[in-house]
């Protein structure tokens, strides 16, 4: 919510809190014998943010600007390469196709591509 409130300091604190929650979740998974080494975690967002100079900047989103069209993805799990950052562009539909691939089901009408570069 801090992003929409035009509170940059709060926005950064929100990102920091989200990072801590993600780490806590991953550590919980890794400390559970049932899930450790067998669980995949995808963390992403449903949209990006305006870049500086576009409309009202980071406090909003929703157009087709460069910032709104890009999201981050953190993918953790035993099937993925570790400590790698992939910088080529992907689309949200590629996330769905990758998850479908991992679960061994077809998405016949999907236009997404499996993100094979992430796999070991």
For the regions a protein language model found, what residue spans apply to each?
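Histidine-centered active-site/metal-ligand motif
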Residues: 1-5, 47, 60-61, 66
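Anion-binding catalytic surfaces of enzymes that hydrolyze or transfer phosphate/sulfate esters
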Residues: 1-18
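Solvent-exposed loop/turn segments at secondary-structure junctions
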Residues: 1-2, 46-51, 78-81
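Short acidic, glycine/proline-rich loop/turn micro-motifs
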Residues: 3-8, 54-56, 84
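A structural signal for well-ordered alpha-helical segments within the folded catalytic domains
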Residues: 16-23, 90-97, 113
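Metal-dependent active-site segment of extracytoplasmic phospho-/sulfohydrolases and closely related
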Residues: 17, 21-59, 99
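Substrate-binding rim/cap in mid-to-C-terminal beta-strand-loop elements of soluble/periplasmic
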Residues: 60-103
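Polar, surface-exposed loop/tail segments
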Residues: 90, 104-120
């Amino acid at each position: 919510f801090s992003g929409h409130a035009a509170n940059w300091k709060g926005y950064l604190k929100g990102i920091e809190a989200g990072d801590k929650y993600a780490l806590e979740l991953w550590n919980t998974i890794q400390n559970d014998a049932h899930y450790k080494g067998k669980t995949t975690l995808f963390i992403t967002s449903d949209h990006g943010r305006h870049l500086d100079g576009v409309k009202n900047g980071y406090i909003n989103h929703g157009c087709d600007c460069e910032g709104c069209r890009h999201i981050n993805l953190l993918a953790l799990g035993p099937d993925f390469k570790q400590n790698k950052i992939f910088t080529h562009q992907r689309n949200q539909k590629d996330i769905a196709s990758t998850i479908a691939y991992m679960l061994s089901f077809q998405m016949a009408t999907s236009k997404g591509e499996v993100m094979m570069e992430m796999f070991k």
